[in-house]
Amino acid sequence: MKYFIVKRALLPAVLVMALMYALITCDNNDSNVAVHNPDQSIVLTSFKPDSGRIREMVLLDGDNFGNDASIIKVFFNEREAKVIGSTGKRILVAVPRLPGDTCILSVEIGKQKKSYSGEFRYKKEASVITIAGNGIRDPRIFDQGLDKAQMQPMYIGADLDFNIFLGDQSDVLLRINEEENLMQIIATRDQGFNHRCQVIVNPSTNVLQMGAEGNGNRDRFAFFDPKKGWAMTYKFVKEWDDNGYTRPAHSGFIANPVNGAPSGSPNSFETHYHCLYCPIDGMYYTRYHSGAIVRIDPDTWKAKIIGMTPMGIAYGVAMHPINQSEMWIGYDGVADANTGIYAHSISKVDVLDDRVGLEDTPVGNAKILASFQKLSAQSYVSGHRDGPLYQAQFFNIRGISFDPDGNLFISEHGNSDIRMVNTMSDPMMVETVIGIPGVAGYINGPKETARFSGNHGLVADQEGNIYVSDYNNNRIRKIAIE
């Protein structure tokens, strides 16, 4: 039934494409076959319409395109569009997904590439539905179908087979499959699972990976292999190379608590929520609350501290899918006392660059890596501001995740909304894709009316769908952004 519905939904689009291609073919009155002449320049004159949504058709007029669509490339900014056909003087293309709010259209044929004057405005659409949870937390119900599930969702991940993995606050890890209407317990507290540890999927092996929380767990990492039914197994660091840095360790208690942390709160510098994979060198990387960035050899389980970032809690950490050595860090606002200007911020660091930068920083005399950059506004004040990332403000970042195109999605617990950073634009731009900043609630539907409440983790799957742990609403929400 689902396959039939999808096919029906695609049918009108196919008909539109066929009709429009027929129209542009009829527009060419030249009976001769149009062949691109590489010795002459391509000519760009105009395009229409000047705005549209994903998969809508755009006509590009000019000359010397040729009618061989296979040699023609069309770009909306840096995003390549699907070329439907060409008459030699007119090209028909489909608008690609999320190319940017304002786009420069360019045509590339062989060694020639030219851009149209004027801009194309991309019309983004976002909507949200609920895929799991009836809004009730207790008693926990995991085995009666997704619509009857009762839970309190925290952090969330997605594998390459469209399974969703959820950490419930009761320290239970769940596998969710929409197609099967299934919620399955994978790990429990008795096995050592902690709900704050985000499940990260290794893009090379599809194995789930996570770090560990709390003092005494510095060397521990957990793995879940789908080939073994996601049975949880542990790996431990066997040898440390401190590399001149201080090894993460329990350091007593916060002396000057801020952001509501009670006096005497444990300073758990041994906590490392994530286990990330870098495809460039095949190593694992993690970040400790102390700020240490650690490289781990998955064959020998030897760990090396490659450098420091400012200390503090970062629930959301992710590797960039295009700039694959970049670790992006979302600092939360209830971090340790010394986090200072890095609270509520988006930052990044290159894990393959171990050069030391600043010796003296606002967070003490740590040798911060030279590649570390705070990218959002130069203030620790929480808030909400869209626009260029260097001016943007956030409030309690609890989860970050990249889609395959390098768009960074951010779950803000404090603002009860979802933000997006186009990390491939210059400057990088931030926008609120769904939810009303500072207005909590529970409403499904389009961007203009949708509501979240105290959302925590989020993850983008391979197709760009966003799954959100809607913490206060006790539900899992799914966002389609196009």
Task: Give the label of every model feature segment.
Residues 21-25:
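C-terminal motif of bacterial Sec signal peptides marking the signal peptidase cleavage site
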Residues 27-67, 71, 101, 112-129:
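Beta-strand/beta-sandwich contexts
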Residues 60, 124-154, 180-195, 214, ...:
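Gly/Pro-rich loop segments of beta-rich domains
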Residues 158-161, 201-205, 277-281, 319-324, ...:
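Residue-level detector of Asp-centered blade-edge/turn motifs that repeat once per structural unit
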Residues 163-166, 206-211, 282-286, 326-330, ...:
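Conserved beta-propeller blade signature
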Residues 171-172, 214-218, 291, 333-338, ...:
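Short glycine/acidic-enriched loop and turn motifs that connect beta-strands
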Residues 393-422, 434:
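Loop/turn-rich, solvent-exposed surfaces of beta-rich toroidal or solenoidal domains
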Residues 446, 453-482:
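Blade-level signature of beta-propeller repeat domains, shared across WD40, Kelch, NHL, RCC1
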